[in-house]
Curated annotation (Swiss-Prot):
It comes from Clostridioides difficile (strain 630) (Peptoclostridium difficile). Belongs to the GCKR-like family. MurNAc-6-P etherase subfamily. Residues 58-221 form the SIS domain. This is N-acetylmuramic acid 6-phosphate etherase. It catalyses: N-acetyl-D-muramate 6-phosphate + H2O = N-acetyl-D-glucosamine 6-phosphate + (R)-lactate. Homodimer.
């Protein structure tokens, strides 16, 4: 029976620290929530080696033309969407490189779609509809580790030959067993029993942040700690781009503006042009040979 399964889930347990939360004043409630949230980063730290291995898998697949797909239901699906949608503007990657699939489709972003998470075949079909191939990475996300929709997607992804990851919050879950590499973050019982949008959701977001950020660093999208492939898609990002160039090269605003324009709004190219003293075409050629890594491109011209 499902009730027996739920009773055995850590995330469905009662938190002894918050049994009196309904009797607290407003500040007391906030303190209880904050105290529980403080434990999440330490729980994530316990899985840092698994997260690092996952990043290496993602980068390897991306360099072979693969993509990363998050798949989840409810809060877990929305966490994947949050992470995936921020990659293109932050790192200048194609919208297809990191994608998110949520049970029930886009309407489920704003409104719960009853029964969608219980349908294994729907998970499989959504993978098919996205055109997932053996080059891709599928990362199933679910606090419980037992969501049928996600399991259906993971099982089919394994049949295709995808690398399959999981992010869960309960030990020895079915999803962990299905994954090539499970990431199991034990955050414990929630502040409000079963409300996995809280500590579980926070942990999921932290892990997703790490997966994509570390992957983008290793893909040459970052120079020092600067987002050098940022897309200049609005006024704020144009000004950020100029500021990044100024910080990376110690030039004045007008110089940064000039080189950004010359580099066709490529922050990375503008920085390398300034640092190398090369014209646009020569700088671009060297950057391309070094797969977009500014540091490696600079090393290569030092050897000339």
């Amino acid at each position: 029976m499902l009730i027996k399964t739920l009773e055995n889930l850590v995330t469905e347990g009662r938190n002894k620290n918050t049994l009196q939360i309904d009797k607290e004043d407003t500040l007391g409630i906030i303190e209880l929530i904050n105290n529980e949230d403080k434990t999440v980063a330490y729980a994530v730290e316990e899985q840092k080696e698994s997260i690092a291995k996952a990043v290496n898998i993602i980068v390897d697949r991306m360099k072979q033309g693969g993509r990363l797909f998050y798949i989840g239901a409810g809060t877990s699906g929305r966490i994947g969407i949050l992470d995936a949608t921020e990659c293109p503007p932050t790192y200048g990657v194609d919208f297809e490189l990191v994608q998110a699939i949520i049970a029930g489709g886009n309407q489920a972003i704003f409104k719960a779609i009853e029964g969608a998470e219980d349908d294994k075949e729907l998970g499989k079909q959504d993978i098919i509809d996205r055109g997932v191939t053996s080059k891709d990475v599928i990362c199933g996300i679910a606090a419980s580790g037992r969501t049928p929709y996600v399991i259906g997607a993971m099982e089919y992804a394994k049949e295709l030959g995808c690398a399959v990851l999981s992010i869960t919050m309960n030990p020895n879950s079915e999803m962990s067993k299905k994954a090539d590499l499970p990431i199991n973050i034990i955050v414990g019982a929630e502040v409000i029993m079963g409300s996995t949008r809280m500590k579980s959701g926070t942990a999921q977001k932290m892990v997703c942040n790490m997966l994509t950020t570390a992957s983008m660093v290793k893909m040459g999208k970052v120079y020092s700690n600067l987002m050098v492939d940022v897309k200049t898609s609005n006024e704020k990002l144009v000004e950020r781009a100029k500021r990044i160039i100024m910080i990376a090269t110690n030039v004045k605003y007008d110089v940064a503006e000039k080189f950004l324009e010359e580099a066709d709004n490529s922050v990375k190219l503008a920085i390398f042009m300034i640092k190398s003293g090369l014209d646009k075409d020569s700088a671009k050629s060297i950057l391309d040979r070094q797969e977009g890594y500014i540091s490696e491109a600079l090393k290569s011209i030092e050897k000339l």
